[in-house]
Swiss-Prot record:
Keyword rRNA processing in record: no
Record's signal peptide: none
Similarity comment text for this entry: Belongs to the TFIIB family.
GO biological process: transcription preinitiation complex assembly
Species: Sulfurisphaera tokodaii (strain DSM 16993 / JCM 10545 / NBRC 100140 / 7)
Source organism phylogeny: Archaea, Thermoproteota, Thermoprotei, Sulfolobales, Sulfolobaceae
UniProt xrefs under SMART domains: CYCLIN
One function term, GO molecular function aspect: TBP-class protein binding
Cellular component terms (Gene Ontology): transcription preinitiation complex
Name used for this protein in its record: Transcription initiation factor IIB
Pfam families, per the entry: TFIIB, Zn_Ribbon_TF
Amino acid sequence: MSESNKSQASATPCPPDKIVFDEERGEYICTETGEVIEERAIDQGPEWRAFTPEEKEKRSRVGGPLNQTIHDMGISTVIDWKDKDAMGRTLDPKRRLEVLRWRKWQIRARIQSSIDRNLAQAMNELERIGNLLNLPKAVKDEAALIYRKAVEKGLVRGRSIESVVAASIYAACRRMKMARTLDEIAQFTKANRKEVARCYRLILRELDINVPVSDPKDYVTRIGSLLGLSGSTMKMAIDIIEKAKESGLTAGKDPAGLAAAAIYIAALLNDERRTQKEIAQIAGVTEVTVRNRYKELTQELKIQIPNQ
């Protein structure tokens, strides 16, 4: 090939479907011109081949992603509890006792320091509360990350693990705009509400965490769904909240209480009546709160309730 032809071949880009990788030489070659596009390329893929998803999973030697809700983030190994060998055969009693001893030592090795023990207990508590509240994994991961930062800052020292975990969950819910009240979270832990609230304020201050202002509308869908209300009733409740915002009635008010009152009004107007007690229990507020917000909204927005 002449020099002019060579320069012309180099100037013309090789079509993507004509580029092949020579594994032996580590080169990307254009089959159309024979030009070496890249040499000494590193193959980032595995050295093994698999033809089914099962084979791929079996031959892979890497673990899953880091898990914030496990005290060691899931990077340590765990001895299986199935009491079976590599061939799937059940272990004999003598071997089973030996493996049991290995397990005990392996657990002790995983949880050696006081911080490890603290995190192990805290992550179990976090998982328990998260499951009871039906929180998504993203919120639990955020709560675990907040708790780990609190441990690093020494905020847990002198405080109960339960109260700091509950406060971390509440902070995560606020950050992720997940409609959960402090009372709702506190009822699933041994710590009292006042202690959880104190830890929550401490976490925000010391970790410099910014949380958005709670919007009453975020609570409407969840409360309405648990009450079995129709979409039109929930939409009406959101409209009532919007009008209340425009009139300046939401400032300084508990968002859950406002949402509960708006739902109560919308349910009455749409003939899907629910009692104040029923709505208050679902919303995690008192009947008095629902009653007071109801009076404010109906009077200030001039809402006429039939048969009232």
